[in-house]
């Protein structure tokens, strides 16, 4: 059996299509666990109605605690040998589970690719493509997740349930929680990972979704996440490992870019900006980024005010091109 987990908070607009795409899977030996994470809208009632039509649906109601908390709750109730995470506002193709399940005898994690779409179904530009290029040992897997050669999102993949029995991702982390979960999983289990470059998962961006909300609090959550990764690598005695270091620099510079792009200022967290601008700065790693990222990062590296000018100009250009 395979367990599909759908955390849901105030998802009344989307939860029905999310659950129905699971019910329509060509692979039928599954259960669908919807975690109602303290919703104040009609999410619970919509799922209860669907539950009355198909016994494979299980509804778990809990006090709001966030995504990590909802996943932890679901993992206490799963019956499947493998778990598949699906966000409440996303959908998957009807042959997704069947296509991934054929590899479960030989692998612990089977990763599919995804499509990035807007609410009207238009496919958006996305540079992502899974490619496991740094090996299967722990160092190789750490490198793959740090450099995003394999997407870190827990959604859109089958994960052996035993790999998540010690799910210890901190509940207070709300940015980068999937990277953290993968790093912990590699540390504890060194999983066998299969990458499939077929986009079964449809990641849908809505204008008012949580991932599109930027404020100082969410910016600092990004800093908190980057610091967690640094601390983790330090505890593993890998902070200065010659194989890990470039991929760690990649992650830190990438997070620094999004921190700046979304309105972050050096005064918000001088220590983080200093780490990115000096200790973890690497021109060779920077060359792997798209030109607009390089422009912003190099401008800030030279002068904060120049960086702000370039960032704002690129943000205006991005809006005009939408």
PLM features: residue spans?
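Short, well-formed alpha-helical segments that are part of the catalytic scaffolds
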Residues: 11-24
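A conserved acidic beta->alpha catalytic loop
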Residues: 36-46, 63
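Membrane-interface aromatic/basic loop that binds lipid-linked glycans or pyrophosphate carriers
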Residues: 262-322
